[in-house]
């Protein structure tokens, strides 16, 4: 009985912490003058708490494991909702594809540029002029 209560406590604690960060993000988003999704702010709060080791990762790990395990199932309602607007998407197929391609290219460029800034130039082992 004690082991099952411990497992229930771990899952309950994980989901309470994840949802606390989510609702804190929603609350902060409602106070901001610009529109930022509360879920994004909540994720950033959770990230900061984990990165600064204020919140031990083992406390949220069981809940994260469950959410990641069933992530595909969570996208089913979104897919059904998109299919309701299939005619509209078909009419706007060109602009949607172009915007997706451009945004993907912009993301690639920003990530490569920021990676270059953060990591600098590092010599590859075996490259001419590098030390072994």
From Swiss-Prot:
Metal-binding is among the record's keywords: no
Top-level taxonomic group: Bacteria
UniProt topology in membrane: Multi-pass membrane protein
Subcellular location: Cell inner membrane
Keyword list, A-Z: Cell inner membrane, Cell membrane, Membrane, Transmembrane, Transmembrane helix
GO cellular component: plasma membrane
Entries under InterPro entries matching the protein: LrgA/CidA (IPR005538), Uncharacterised_UPF0299 (IPR022957)
Pfam families named in the record: LrgA
Annotated transmembrane regions: 7-27, 31-51, 63-83, 93-113
Keyword Repeat: no
Protein family: Belongs to the UPF0299 family.
NCBIfam families named in the record: PRK01821.1
Record's protein name: UPF0299 membrane protein CKO_00648
